[in-house]
Amino acid sequence: MDKKFIRNFSIIAHIDHGKSTLSDRIIEFTNTLSKREMTNQILDSMDIERERGITIKLNAVQIKYHAKDKHEYLIHLIDTPGHVDFTYEVSRSLAACEGAILVVDAAQGIEAQTLSNVYLALENNLEIVPTINKIDLPSADPNRVKKEIEDVIGLDTADVPLISAKTGLNIQDVLEAIIKHVPPPLDAKDDAKLQALIFDSFYDSYKGVVCLVRVKQGTIKVGDKIRMMANNKDYIVSELGIRTPKIVNKTELVAGEVGWVAAAIKTVKDINVGDTITHTNNPADKPLPGYKKILPMVYCGLYPIDTSQYDDLKEAMAKISLSDAALTYEYETSQALGFGIRCGFLGLLHMDVIRERIAREFNIELILTAPSVIYKIELTNNQEISIDSPAKMPEPTSIKLIKEPFVKLAIITPDNYVGAIMELCQSRRGIYDDLEVIDGTRRKLIYKMPLAEIMYSFFDSLKSITKGYATMDYELIGYQAEKLVKIDIMLNGNKVDALSIIAHRDFAYGKSKIICERLKEVIPKHQFEIPIQASIGSKIIARETIKAVRKDVIAKCYGGDVSRKKKLLEQQKEGKKRLKAIGNVDVPQDAFVKVLSEN
């Protein structure tokens, strides 16, 4: 096929602006799937994606479209997630395209993640085609949104498609805009040395690891001996093809095409997403510039509530990590919770999705320890170490200073909530940076803020005080030294490692008090008094006491001498002393679940 009839594009938007619905309508309009085969969110392959109405894994399909100019075009559509946690999925799909459709909600207008995805597309030199969706809503105001797109992003909206992905209104306008504005891969040559960009991979129990690739140069065929340029490993192509979104086998993929390649690869760890595939016997001179590797931002320990399921949890993590390149994990143990796994996630939604997948797909209920970020610690001997867990914090005497990650936080909000948002940001140690006017009623607030503060229910608080109207986006900007301390929680004088947290010194007392009070509520009474203490080093900063349960030892004495009663009470007193010295505090698992989930 002539390269001028190929188009590769992706759909980008803020979460919930209608990307997946637009993908459905495009697939339906071009008769790529029959009516019987269509389901809502056809590209969202996981149940959890359909239920939450979000896209987590990117997906790529090939579509044939007969345009108004009487030519047939081969269009590759790559659907991407919109949530800030899954930006790495977006960056990968954009590297495989020449253009992007920017979907903007006709009622809500430009949101925080609309902007961050636009900047990603511009970094990849993509042609951006703005599209205004949901024009069938009573609150839709396409003219206001057009002006926003022109003023804030600087794109021309003279012939912007006005569509309703839900009803299928004007879907052909979007396809015509793609043909008109997205450039074809004219520099792609079928006879050049093979260069294919791996932009995703997933595990198939029959084929092994399947790579989703964009063939930039050359041709790849079944039986070819191929090499991964990052690790120099060689494989033989066993199968390849395209997705429509059904898997369709082919004998070859040519330059400009997007498809999948299977080559009996055992684990996803053997594949670097962003790597280049080339031929072993006639390799390309240099690899394609891959997408940037994004490191985990949030760390958390996962422990099975039923400790006998630890081996099942290890197997579950191995299987999930086969299809999730951003998930990192290592094994760890806790005195309180037993054996577990410490995982690195991209954010709290990513963490929640993994927890839910483990519960659903493998039937393992988990306790999650308090989420933590990576802290950099400068020691008194001038060495610098990084820690992702309070348990790894060195002794206070050996610490010179502690640095924590800061993010640039952008919040877009109706102007009547600006005051409440500023109060929220200041209470979370935010540093005011800028306030921009988006239109007559909306403002964009910029703050510098510690990442750790955003992780603890910041998004929920933001939605609550703005009645759900505000949107946010953040990016890591570096590390900054702060007055941070490790807070240990002790039960009956013994440290409970699973409950330790790192907090700012100014907020340490408040956080400690809350944890102690929660523990007092959930730990059952014992036959001896239990002190619950929070300490920084050797200094106790908060305390609650669980009173002993009273056992009536003199109930059996009817009348008689008072000295008999005194003797029994003295014996009980001695027994309680011994229990307090050697007795273990029995903390039920649901107490950990309750305290850690609310932490």
Swiss-Prot record:
InterPro entries according to UniProt: EF-4, EFG_III/V, EFG_V-like, EFTu-like_2, G_TR_CS, LepA_C_sf, LepA_CTD, LepA_IV
EC number of this enzyme: 3.6.5.n1
PANTHER family: TRANSLATION FACTOR GUF1 HOMOLOG, CHLOROPLASTIC, TRANSLATION FACTOR GUF1-RELATED
Catalytic activity: GTP + H2O = GDP + phosphate + H(+)
Cellular location(s): Cell membrane
Membrane-topology annotation of the record: Peripheral membrane protein
GO cellular component: plasma membrane
Stated family: Belongs to the TRAFAC class translation factor GTPase superfamily. Classic translation factor GTPase family. LepA subfamily.
Database matches in CDD domains: EF4_II, EF4_III, LepA, lepA_C
Protein known as: Elongation factor 4
GO biological process: positive regulation of translation
